[in-house]
Amino acid sequence: RPDLRMRNLCAPIRPRTMNLQLSLCTGLVGAAFWCLTVIIGFLIYGGRLGGADPRTVLLMIGNSFVYLIVALSLSFLVSLFIRGGNVQNAVANFLALALSFLGGAFVPLELLGDGILTVSRFTPTFWYTSALEKITALTRYDWAVLAPVVGDILVQLGFAAAFFSVALVLGRLRRQSSSGFAPTATEMNG
């Protein structure tokens, strides 16, 4: 609601602090749901993990946590452009499906054509899937084998940092522009 946004922006805290608080709160909620998902996964598939190396399982969990950070950063960026709840849900579904397809979550990467693979390298899901495939193929855990996995995870963190940085810059530009405070119908003026 625009009136609520305007009321929050005139609070006696700096916009940077407000963004930090919003980001931390979003991160905490995301982490809570991530933990719940991991716990449910262990409850459902725990029996199948009996022979799995715990280091492999921990790397998979860590990779999924990094992807959570990517998803939260992307959602923060998208939320700057879309305000309505229904439209946000539609865009979230579209982005999730598009990134999942391009990143190899629906179709294995080796079945994708060269053109699609080239495009998918520009998505964080590609690097998540790539790291996951490398983690599941691990037979030893020295740096020579782990370096490609760490590289894929760092690329995901780079995407997260880029999304978050762009969101902060666009948020600042939006606050500073006069169109950010265009006449708005509130409860006071109808």
Locations of the language-model features?
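Short helix-loop junctions at transmembrane helix boundaries
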Residues: 34-58, 66, 80-85, 105-111, ...
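Hydrophobic alpha-helical transmembrane segments of polytopic membrane proteins
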Residues: 58-85, 100-103, 158-167
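Hydrophobic alpha-helical transmembrane segments
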Residues: 57-65, 90-94, 119, 150-158
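Transmembrane helix boundary and interhelical loop/hinge segments in multi-pass membrane proteins
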Residues: 1-16
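Selective transmembrane-helix segments that form parts of the transport pathway or gating/packing helices
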Residues: 15-45, 61, 65, 69, ...
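Short hydrophobic, aromatic-rich alpha-helical segments embedded in or entering the lipid bilayer
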Residues: 109-150
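Transmembrane helix segments
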Residues: 85-122
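Alpha-helical transmembrane segments of multi-pass membrane transporters/translocases
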Residues: 134-190
